[in-house]
């Protein structure tokens, strides 16, 4: 039997009757910070947010990096912008996307922009998400 040891700096809890949802902060500059609740989605390639957050952060939505995102239910257009993303006390600069659709239903924390910056542990039975900044050591 192999022993694997992981350590985490933070532990976040989420609601038993909801998806794995965490509170984050997005900022476009030091004076603009927005609190957002978002779903952790290991199947999503990108972090994708509802479009009104782009406007609250001062972005011109369509001046971002345009991508066509495909899902099992169809596809949609989103625009990428550089932000500072904060979860707990962990912070980094990254590219996230804002959906073009006004009625985009959910904010998503995917592999690119979120999970690729963290080591995570999930104990769903206890509704706990353990996180630590990713480093190569």
PLM region spans:
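Pepsin/retropepsin-fold aspartyl endopeptidases
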Residues: 1-137
């Amino acid at each position: 039997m192999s022993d694997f040891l992981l350590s985490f700096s933070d532990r976040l809890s989420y609601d038993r009757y909801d998806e794995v949802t965490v509170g984050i902060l997005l900022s476009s500059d030091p004076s603009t910070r927005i609190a957002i609740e978002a779903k952790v989605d290991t199947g999503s390639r990108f972090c994708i947010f509802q479009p009104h957050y782009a406007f609250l952060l001062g972005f011109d939505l369509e001046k971002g990096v345009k991508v066509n995102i495909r899902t099992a239910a169809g596809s949609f257009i989103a625009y990428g912008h550089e932000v500072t993303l904060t979860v707990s006390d962990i912070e980094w600069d990254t590219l996230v996307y804002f959906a073009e659709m006004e009625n985009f239903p959910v904010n998503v924390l995917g592999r690119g922009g979120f999970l690729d910056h963290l080591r995570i542990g999930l104990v769903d039975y206890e509704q706990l998400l353990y996180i630590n900044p990713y480093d190569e050591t």
